[in-house]
Swiss-Prot record:
Protein's name in the database: Apolipoprotein A-I
Entry annotated with the keyword Transmembrane helix: no
GO cellular component: chylomicron; extracellular vesicle; high-density lipoprotein particle; low-density lipoprotein particle; very-low-density lipoprotein particle
Maturation and modification: Glycosylated. Palmitoylated.
Modification sites for Methionine sulfoxide: 193
Lineage, opening ranks: Eukaryota, Metazoa, Chordata, Craniata, Vertebrata
Function: Participates in the reverse transport of cholesterol from tissues to the liver for excretion by promoting cholesterol efflux from tissues and by acting as a cofactor for the lecithin cholesterol acyltransferase (LCAT). As part of the SPAP complex, activates spermatozoa motility.
Parts of the chain that traverse the membrane: none
Region (10 X approximate tandem repeats), start-end ranges: 67-264
Family listed: Belongs to the apolipoprotein A1/A4/E family.
Subcellular location: Secreted
Subunit structure comment from the entry: Homodimer. Interacts with APOA1BP and CLU. Component of a sperm activating protein complex (SPAP), consisting of APOA1, an immunoglobulin heavy chain, an immunoglobulin light chain and albumin. Interacts with NDRG1. Interacts with SCGB3A2. Interacts with NAXE and YJEFN3.
Source species, domain of life: Eukaryota
Length: 264
């Protein structure tokens, strides 16, 4: 299972570079995506949690029990922020290590893409040339009709449209033929690229780097757990005043209710 996860992660990193190679864009790094998602999630939890606490304090039950949960919310929020930062640093180390370990795979895939692009380029240029020739051919046939339209009377408009229709259909059909030819020509290169990627994945799975990375990943997970312990302990300590306050309020309410029943 770990091997599958690492292979998928390697493909994700290599795929990001391949997409950048073809599209010439500037994609976010894997760490940026994870960090942005984690920050938004924790911020949403803190914001919504604060709203729920304020609503509970303002409710009739909260006022009756004198919960005052809002008094402890800032402390809990600070602990959550610290926990977020601790996890963030550890996770960034993991992504940096993973990207470094798979740099050779990204380089090989980039070279494969460059090779396939070089082979495909003549077919793309030929396709563009053929389409351009068809467009020019269409223009040459249409040009006399345009002159005829300008020089002729309005009643000839319908006749002109009837002449244009088959020419447009002919251009469409001939362009489709060129597209089919291009698709047939590019099919072997698509299969070649698929086989190359499969080969690179097999090399990755059989390499000593993957086995070594298994050990590093296990060590990292253990380290992550150790780093999380202090933050979780702080969170537990921050919750204790809230729980004690809640417990005292409930016991006080029960005591008052018992006294009222005894007085009756």
């Amino acid at each position: 299972m770990k091997a599958v996860l690492l292979v998928v992660a390697a493909l994700f990193l290599a795929g990001s570079q391949a997409r950048h190679f073809w599209q010439q864009d500037d994609p976010k790094t894997s760490w940026d995506v994870v960090k942005e998602f984690a920050n938004k999630y924790v911020d949403a939890v803190k914001e919504s949690g604060k709203g729920y606490v304020e609503q509970l304090d303002a409710s009739s039950l909260g006022q009756q029990l004198n919960l005052r949960l809002s008094d402890n919310w800032d402390t809990l929020s600070t602990i959550l922020t610290k926990l977020q930062a601790d996890f963030g640093l550890a996770t960034q180390e993991f992504w940096d290590t993973l990207e470094k370990e798979t740099e050779w795979l990204k380089q090989i895939v980039s070279e494969d893409l460059q090779d396939v692009k070089h082979k495909v380029q003549p077919y793309l240029e030929n396709f563009q040339k053929k389409v351009q020739e068809e467009v020019e051919r269409y223009r040459e046939k249409v040009r006399p009709l345009g002159i005829e339209l300008r020089d002729g009377a309005r009643q000839k408009l319908q006749e002109l449209q009837e002449k244009l229709t088959p020419l447009g259909e002919d251009l469409r059909d001939r362009t489709r033929e060129h597209v089919d030819v291009l698709r047939t020509q590019l099919a072997p290169f698509s299969e070649e690229m698929r086989q190359r990627l499969a080969k690179r994945l097999e090399e990755l799975k059989d390499s000593a780097t993957l086995a070594d990375y298994h050990a590093k990943a296990s060590e990292h997970l253990k380290m992550l757990g150790e780093k999380a312990k202090p933050a979780l302990e702080d969170l537990r300590q921050g919750l204790l005043p809230v729980l004690e306050n809640l417990k005292a309020s409930i016991l006080s309410s029960i005591d008052q209710a018992s006294k009222q029943l005894a007085a009756q």
